[in-house]
Amino acid sequence: MALMVTRRYLLGGEYPSEEFVQASLEKYFFRQGFDIDTGSYIDLICRDKESRDVVWHIEVKGKTSQPGLDFRTCLGQLVQRMTKDNINYAIAVPRIKQYERLIEETSIL
Protein backbone atom coordinates (compact mmCIF):
# COMPACT_ATOMS: atom_id res chain seq x y z
CA MET A 1 0.00 0.00 0.00
CA ALA A 2 1.42 3.41 -0.98
CA LEU A 3 1.44 6.37 1.37
CA MET A 4 -0.71 9.32 0.37
CA VAL A 5 0.56 12.62 1.77
CA THR A 6 -2.65 14.31 2.87
CA ARG A 7 -1.67 17.77 4.09
CA ARG A 8 -0.91 20.50 1.60
CA TYR A 9 0.46 23.96 2.33
CA LEU A 10 0.39 27.29 0.50
CA LEU A 11 4.17 27.50 0.21
CA GLY A 12 4.35 24.16 -1.62
CA GLY A 13 6.36 21.03 -1.10
CA GLU A 14 9.93 22.10 -1.80
CA TYR A 15 12.66 22.06 0.85
CA PRO A 16 12.61 23.74 3.41
CA SER A 17 8.82 24.20 3.45
CA GLU A 18 6.53 22.76 6.13
CA GLU A 19 4.91 20.52 3.53
CA PHE A 20 8.34 19.06 2.65
CA VAL A 21 9.17 18.38 6.32
CA GLN A 22 5.71 16.87 6.94
CA ALA A 23 5.85 14.64 3.84
CA SER A 24 9.38 13.47 4.69
CA LEU A 25 8.30 12.42 8.18
CA GLU A 26 5.16 10.70 6.92
CA LYS A 27 7.21 8.67 4.44
CA TYR A 28 9.84 7.78 7.04
CA PHE A 29 7.36 6.59 9.67
CA PHE A 30 5.23 4.76 7.09
CA ARG A 31 8.31 2.83 5.92
CA GLN A 32 9.10 1.97 9.56
CA GLY A 33 5.70 0.30 9.95
CA PHE A 34 3.65 3.09 11.50
CA ASP A 35 0.08 4.16 10.81
CA ILE A 36 -0.05 7.85 9.93
CA ASP A 37 -2.74 10.23 11.21
CA THR A 38 -2.88 13.84 10.00
CA GLY A 39 -6.55 14.40 10.73
CA SER A 40 -6.26 16.05 14.13
CA TYR A 41 -4.97 19.29 15.61
CA ILE A 42 -1.58 17.58 16.04
CA ASP A 43 0.43 17.89 12.82
CA LEU A 44 1.44 14.24 12.75
CA ILE A 45 0.53 11.22 14.87
CA CYS A 46 2.42 7.99 14.15
CA ARG A 47 1.39 4.70 15.76
CA ASP A 48 3.27 1.42 15.39
CA LYS A 49 1.08 -0.99 13.40
CA GLU A 50 2.27 -4.05 15.30
CA SER A 51 2.42 -3.10 18.95
CA ARG A 52 0.22 0.04 18.90
CA ASP A 53 2.21 0.99 22.02
CA VAL A 54 4.79 3.16 20.26
CA VAL A 55 3.19 6.51 19.49
CA TRP A 56 4.69 9.78 18.28
CA HIS A 57 3.03 13.22 18.36
CA ILE A 58 5.02 15.58 16.14
CA GLU A 59 4.62 19.31 15.56
CA VAL A 60 6.05 20.37 12.20
CA LYS A 61 7.35 23.73 11.02
CA GLY A 62 9.04 24.81 7.82
CA LYS A 63 10.99 27.91 6.85
CA THR A 64 8.92 31.03 7.42
CA SER A 65 9.41 34.79 7.52
CA GLN A 66 9.27 34.66 11.35
CA PRO A 67 11.10 31.52 12.46
CA GLY A 68 11.48 32.70 16.07
CA LEU A 69 7.76 33.26 16.51
CA ASP A 70 6.86 30.02 14.73
CA PHE A 71 9.40 27.99 16.72
CA ARG A 72 8.11 29.31 20.05
CA THR A 73 4.52 28.68 18.91
CA CYS A 74 5.51 25.12 18.02
CA LEU A 75 7.09 24.61 21.46
CA GLY A 76 3.96 25.93 23.15
CA GLN A 77 1.69 23.69 21.10
CA LEU A 78 3.80 20.67 21.95
CA VAL A 79 4.05 21.40 25.67
CA GLN A 80 0.28 21.97 25.96
CA ARG A 81 -0.35 18.56 24.44
CA MET A 82 2.12 16.61 26.56
CA THR A 83 -0.49 14.79 28.59
CA LYS A 84 0.65 11.15 28.57
CA ASP A 85 3.90 9.54 29.64
CA ASN A 86 3.71 6.75 27.05
CA ILE A 87 3.75 9.09 24.02
CA ASN A 88 6.92 10.33 22.31
CA TYR A 89 6.67 14.08 21.63
CA ALA A 90 8.79 15.82 19.01
CA ILE A 91 9.28 18.94 16.94
CA ALA A 92 10.39 18.65 13.33
CA VAL A 93 11.96 21.58 11.48
CA PRO A 94 14.20 21.80 8.43
CA ARG A 95 17.93 21.92 9.04
CA ILE A 96 18.47 25.61 8.38
CA LYS A 97 20.56 28.17 10.24
CA GLN A 98 17.60 30.03 11.79
CA TYR A 99 16.19 26.90 13.43
CA GLU A 100 19.61 25.56 14.43
CA ARG A 101 20.25 28.79 16.37
CA LEU A 102 16.84 28.61 18.06
CA ILE A 103 17.38 24.98 19.04
CA GLU A 104 20.80 25.82 20.53
CA GLU A 105 19.20 28.62 22.57
CA THR A 106 16.50 26.33 23.97
CA SER A 107 17.06 24.98 27.48
CA ILE A 108 17.24 21.24 27.90
CA LEU A 109 15.44 20.10 31.03
Where are the regions that the model predicts?
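Nucleic-acid nuclease catalytic cores
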Residues: M82-L109
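Active-site-adjacent loop/helix micro-motif of nuclease/hydrolase catalytic cores
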Residues: S65-L75, Y99-L102
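Histidine-anchored nucleotide/phosphate-binding helix
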Residues: T73-T83
